Every structure is written in C-alpha cells, then in structure tokens.
Amino acid sequence: MQCSDVQATEPDIKVSLTRVGVTNLKKLVKIKRKSKRDIVLLPTFEVYVDLPSSQKGIHMSRSPEVIEEVVENIIVEKEIYGVEELSVEIVMKLFEKHEYATRAEVMLYSDYMMEEKSPVTKKDSQEVGKIMARAYGVKDDSGMISVKKMVGAEVVGITACPCAQNLLKENAINKLIEKGFSNEDIEKILDSVTIATHNQRGIGTIMIEVPNGYTVGISKIIKIIKESMSGEVYELLKRSDEAYVVELAHKNPKFVEDCAREMIKRVVEVFDYLPEDTQVIVRQVNKESIHRHDAFAERKSKMGELRDELEI
C-alpha cells in the first residue's frame, strides 16, 4: 500500500511561509586547507526553505537528508576549502530536494580551536572561538538560482570601561591635592599607576559576504576581533600573565561602541580588495560586571558605504 503525500495537499489556511526547516542539527565535517592539515569541525546547522500557500508542508526529512548527502560527498569525493562553500553546496541541494521552494537558507556555526601562548610565560593553551557561515539562495521564475554567502567569527575578549576609569582618576587627583601633592607630582603618580575601572567580557562578531571569485580568511576576521577590544582573554594564565592582561586592558579602555567602530575600521583596511556592494555585519556585546544588563552595538552596511564614511 502506497502512503499518500500529505505534505503536498492543500492547507486549511492558505498562507505562504517564509522559512520552514530544521534547526540544531549537528554533523561532523572535514574542511580542507591548502598546505595545512585538515580542520575537523562539529557544526550545528539550520536549514530552511520557503513554502507556498498551496502546500500543507515541506518534506521535512529531505532537509537533514541533504546535509547528510553533502557531508558524505565531501568525505568521499569533493574537497571543500571553506564553511561558506559547504553552505552553498547545501543550498543548491535543498533546491533539488524541495522543487517547490523559491528560497533556501543555511546557517552553520561551530566551535573553533585555536592554539595560543600566554603573553608573558608563553604557556601553551587551547582557546575556543566560534566560526559561522550563511548561504542564501533565490530561484527566479526561469529556474535560475543565485546564491549569496557569508563567513564570520565570534571571539571573546576583555573590555575596560573608560567612564568609570575617568571618575576614579578625578577622585584620585582630588585626594592627592588634599594631601598637598603638586600638579607635577600628581602627573608623575598618575603616569606610574594603573587606574581602576570595571570590566566586561566582550563578545565580538563579524560576518562578511564572500562574493564569487573572492576569498575572506576566517583567521583574519578572528585577529580583527581580538585586536578591537581592550585586551585578549586566555584559558591559562600564571601570575605574571594575569598582571599583564589586566594592566593592558586598563591602559586601553573602550566602550562597546569603540569596539564596534574599531572592528569596522580594521575590516575596511584588511579587506580593501572586496567590492563596494559587499555586505558587512559587525556586532559587539559586552557582559556588564556592575549592571544586570549588557551593552550592545552593531553596524550592518555595504563595504562602499563604510569606505565613504571612513574616507578610506
């Protein structure tokens, strides 16, 4: 007895849906690197297609089936050199499996291990960041498919608040004046000590479109995020390392807005070869230490617009 295709029947309420699919799907993936060892990732996938108003449901099992087929094909036949390429492969396969779809989207994100050394004692440690990719495909009336892809990373760092630091500096100056110190001595003292402030654990995120024929290195994105906060964080720190990290962050205080703007500037400088219409997303979230809320800053723009603003 053949089962009827319930998904293909008409729905009771004839309204189209923008995205239908599966989320939180994990698969082991191997990414090739030229002249370097392969990277093995365990990414989490989100895959979606749109659904016309005339159809009750998508064929849900086809979406995880697509990921399984693409991942297996990578292992056996095809070499993939980037997570964004993997996303594009899945999008194209989604259109094959879901012939009624006019839009398909894939998001993947994965932990990414980085080998680091502590800043003073040079102790080896493994640091964890996140890498991510997105591909979005559209099929026109003639059946032609166009796909845009993005790649990015998320990195944790430390930020020090400039406002609180300035308040404490003013308090210190007033107390030193009360104790009879000269302006010259006060200046020497302040130049010799680190002024306290409250800190945040900063989370920087950058996503950059990868136009056809271009490459965007994830390692470069990670470096930009790290260098855009007050300082880096490390899994392993000895005493001298800890003192160095804390002092460095307090000598480089930054608001959440400063971090976002620094990332934007560095993205424009590092990826100066990308076309004007390349999409860029920059986001900074600072987990506050003296508030219950978090601080947030974001910019979504085209590369050309950013270049014009920065006059680069």
Swiss-Prot record:
<dbReference type="Pfam" id="PF02649">
    <property type="entry name" value="GCHY-1"/>
</dbReference>
<keyword id="KW-0408">Iron</keyword>
<comment type="function">
    <text>Converts GTP to 7,8-dihydro-D-neopterin 2',3'-cyclic phosphate, the first intermediate in the biosynthesis of coenzyme methanopterin.</text>
</comment>
<comment type="subunit">
    <text>Homodimer.</text>
</comment>
<keyword id="KW-0479">Metal-binding</keyword>
<dbReference type="GO" id="GO:0005506">
    <property type="term" value="F:iron ion binding"/>
</dbReference>
<keyword id="KW-0378">Hydrolase</keyword>
<dbReference type="InterPro" id="IPR003801">
    <property type="entry name" value="GTP_cyclohydrolase_FolE2/MptA"/>
</dbReference>
<dbReference type="GO" id="GO:0003934">
    <property type="term" value="F:GTP cyclohydrolase I activity"/>
</dbReference>
<dbReference type="InterPro" id="IPR022840">
    <property type="entry name" value="GTP_cyclohydrolase_MptA"/>
</dbReference>
<protein>
    <recommendedName>
        <fullName>GTP cyclohydrolase MptA</fullName>
        <ecNumber>3.5.4.39</ecNumber>
    </recommendedName>
</protein>
<dbReference type="GO" id="GO:2001118">
    <property type="term" value="P:tetrahydromethanopterin biosynthetic process"/>
</dbReference>
<comment type="similarity">
    <text>Belongs to the GTP cyclohydrolase IV family.</text>
</comment>
<feature type="site" description="May be catalytically important">
    <location>
        <position position="161"/>
    </location>
</feature>
<comment type="pathway">
    <text>Cofactor biosynthesis; 5,6,7,8-tetrahydromethanopterin biosynthesis.</text>
</comment>
<dbReference type="GO" id="GO:0044682">
    <property type="term" value="F:GTP cyclohydrolase IV activity"/>
</dbReference>
